[in-house]
């Protein structure tokens, strides 16, 4: 997991080949007027924009998830977003089977750590990171 601000996003371009186009896409957007929905940017790179108000820690854990293939970059545009995290290796209570079509495994475990994102901060969740939301 990586937590940082958009100002430092360029430091992570070398971590994964899709990080640079993802962050360049974000930088080119008017974040205060961004549309809600799913958008394919390029092969293997999809943006899901959710403009909902940030969730509390309690509401976030209702969807405690991880992915086998995808990496999530989640951005707080404005406000305060509470998130939960736990290493996948410590999760022992799967909530159903892995959904290959959606690339998601849900867990009933509780996060080890809660943290907040505020204006223009992002988090990158890798497959070994179980996160909420």
Predicted regions and their residues:
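Conserved metal-binding segment of the jelly-roll/cupin
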Residues: 115-133
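A short glycine-rich, His/Asp/Glu-containing loop-to-beta-strand
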Residues: 36-57, 64-65, 69-77, 85
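A short, N-terminal "cap"/entry segment at the start of jelly-roll beta-barrel domains
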Residues: 1-48, 63
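Short, conserved beta-strand element in jelly-roll/cupin
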Residues: 68-81, 87-89, 97-108
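Beta-hairpin (beta-strand-turn-beta-strand) motif
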Residues: 52, 76-80, 86-90, 120, ...
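Compositionally biased, non-globular sequence tracts
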Residues: 12-28, 93, 97-106, 119
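A short local loop/turn or secondary-structure capping micro-motif enriched for an aromatic residue
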Residues: 56-57, 91-94, 133
């Amino acid at each position: 997991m990586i937590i940082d601000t958009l100002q430092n996003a360029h430091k992570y371009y070398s971590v994964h080949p899709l990080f640079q186009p993802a962050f360049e896409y974000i930088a080119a957007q008017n974040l205060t007027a961004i549309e809600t929905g799913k958008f394919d940017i390029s092969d293997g790179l999809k943006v899901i924009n959710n403009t909902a108000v940030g969730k509390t820690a309690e509401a976030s854990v209702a969807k405690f998830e991880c992915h086998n293939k995808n990496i999530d970059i989640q951005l707080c545009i404005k406000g305060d977003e509470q998130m939960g995290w736990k290493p996948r290796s410590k999760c022992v209570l799967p909530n159903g089977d892995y959904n290959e079509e959606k690339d998601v495994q849900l867990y009933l475990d509780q996060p080890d750590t809660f943290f907040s994102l505020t204006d223009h901060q992002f988090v990158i969740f890798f497959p070994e990171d179980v996160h909420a939301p």
